[in-house]
A protein has these predicted regions:
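Double-stranded RNA-binding/processing signature
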Residues: 1-162
Length: 162
């Protein structure tokens, strides 16, 4: 585990937006680590691909993949995060996407602070295996990257060199 849980902190009393703040960092680290491990892209391209995984739009779709897997307690945390969203929204997101992404980040932050990195990894694996980001770079669902210049970025993803 990268960081240790802090049982002395009552996580259930924390602000959902504070949990989302932590969850945002958790997701960013997971995505960046996985991209570095599974691709040979240049740093600028890594950043471009990573931003598509962590956008509010993407998080809304990622949440749809894992929502059926959530326990009742996790669903309650997710709901708290969705309901805590600020009135303002991100530039490139709808209000619904922004609320969902805040709830998703709240859940990740809560799981992390509870020391449930095993659960985070389980949920992230489902996302990584099943989510295709919509991005400006060409991404094709494909099990092999046999096109000239294409590099594998994740299981079943190829990003064509530009």
């Amino acid at each position: 585990m990268l960081f240790e849980a802090h049982p002395e902190i009552d996580i259930h009393e924390m602000s959902p937006l504070a949990l989302a703040f932590a969850g945002d960092a958790v997701l960013e680290l997971l995505v960046r680590q996985r991209l570095v491990e599974t691709s040979r892209l240049q740093p600028g391209r890594l950043h471009s691909v990573a931003t598509h995984y962590v956008s509010a739009h993407a998080q809304n779709q990622e949440l749809a993949l894992i929502e059926p897997m959530l326990t009742e307690e996790e669903q309650n945390i997710l709901r708290r995060g969705k309901n805590a969203s600020k009135a303002s929204v991100a530039k490139h997101a709808t209000a619904q996407e922004y609320r969902a992404s805040t709830g998703f980040e709240c859940l990740l932050g809560w799981l992390h602070l509870m020391g449930r990195d095993d659960r985070i990894e389980e949920l992230f694996e489902t996302i990584w295996k099943n989510y295709t980001p919509e991005q400006e770079v060409t991404v094709r669902r494909n099990t092999s990257c046999n096109k000239a210049g294409a590099q594998q970025t994740a299981p079943a993803f190829c990003v064509a060199a530009q």
